[in-house]
A protein has these predicted regions:
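Donor-binding/catalytic cores of nucleotide-activated saccharide
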Residues: 70, 91-202, 210-228
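Short, well-formed alpha-helical segments that are part of the catalytic scaffolds
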Residues: 13-26
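Short beta-strand/loop segment that forms part of the nucleotide-sugar
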Residues: 32-41, 61-66, 91
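Catalytic core of nucleotide-sugar-dependent glycosyltransferases
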Residues: 207-216, 222-252, 268-269, 274-295
Length: 329
């Protein structure tokens, strides 16, 4: 049984895939890992490249599936994983050199921990690597029975990005947490919110896990036409959070903390939708009207004057007028 299972969802990344896979294969140390490439119905040469790489390089497994989105592809990889520990990597990014060697040391030093969290570097279009300004990670263990405290620690360490996690597979199986297939954007955060209910000990490592490529055109993060998909994902995540509250998995305090975190995801997207073209605003509006009453505030909204003004306009004049007014600026 391998020590690590590295899950890489693949979709239309023919220009980046080889570099991503080789960043795993070229890790120094024993071949105590498996790398699972999940081709999510790519329409370019990515699927064929997966097969060619698996034929050429050791340790690779390839799964081809119909297109279902990043969350569904990660779930497919989880189902196939056999390693003791799980790592995730996006197919346009790269694993940091020497990561697995550093993780072997961390796992041996902290055998009682189920969830390790590291850092990343931003991979700029010109090839340079820069630290992410939003990271405020304090290395070391963090334990608390207070869900809100655990959530704050995770959020402060750089939000929720599974490609800088190392998670014990048996812990994840016992928690029975999976990615939400209907959440086609930012699928990490509902996964994290739910998994955090089952884990009262985190370990923050001052270790770079990933070189995260920024500014790639056509991604869900950079393409404006994907804004409606983001709101559909937010609505799906909200339904999941409501079920966790209804079935008692999340108590009242935990649910309130989840909603506060969800607000910090919702409000920036609502503000972004306000300044896009009319068709995008029209597609986003039903989701904004549905979700806005659930998120009266968020920490980001409370700390910036423009967010407070935008929130006041939404509450006073309603989404339609606010989106129209923002589009006229």
């Amino acid at each position: 049984m391998p020590l690590f299972s590295i899950i890489i969802p693949v979709y239309n990344v023919q220009n980046y895939l080889s570099a991503c896979v080789k960043s795993v294969v070229e890790q120094p140390g024993p071949r105590d890992w498996e790398c699972i490439l999940v081709d999510d119905g790519s329409t370019d040469q990515s699927g064929a490249m997966c097969d060619a790489l698996a034929a050429e390089l050791p340790g690779l497994k390839v799964i081809h599936r119909e297109n279902g989105g990043l969350a569904a592809a990660r779930n497919t990889g989880l189902k196939a994983a056999t390693g003791d520990w799980l790592l995730f990597l996006d197919s346009d990014d790269a694993m940091a050199p020497g990561l697995l060697a550093q993780l072997r040391g961390a796992l041996a030093a902290h055998p009682d921990c189920d969830w390790f969290i590291g850092t990343h570097l931003e991979w700029q279009p010109d090839g340079t690597l820069t630290p992410h300004d939003g990271l405020h990670l304090v290395p070391g263990p963090f334990a608390s029975s207070d869900y809100a405290a655990r959530l704050k620690a995770l959020y402060t360490a750089g939000h929720w990005s599974v490609w800088k996690y190392c998670i014990r597979r048996s812990f994840l199986e016992q928690a029975r947490v999976r990615f939400l297939p209907d959440c086609v954007w930012a699928e990490d955060w509902p996964f994290d919110l739910e998994l955090l209910l089952h884990c009262d000990r985190l370990y923050f490592l001052d270790t770079v896990f990933t070189h995260y490529r920024v500014g790639r055109q056509g991604s869900l993060l950079t393409d404006a036409k994907n804004l409606p998909k983001r709101f559909r994902g937010l609505a799906a995540a909200q339904r999941r959070l409501a079920r966790l509250s209804a079935n008692g998995t999340a108590d009242a305090a935990a649910y309130a903390a989840m909603q506060d975190a969800a607000a910090d995801v919702f409000w920036p997207q609502a503000r972004t939708a306000a300044v896009r073209d009319a068709a995008i605003r029209k597609a986003c509006l039903p989701y904004i009207e549905q979700l806005r009453p659930l998120y009266p505030h968020g920490t980001e909204v409370r700390t910036r004057r423009d967010w407070r003004l935008f929130q006041w306009m939404m509450q006073t004049f309603g989404p339609k007028f606010t989106l129209w007014a923002a589009s006229r600026r």
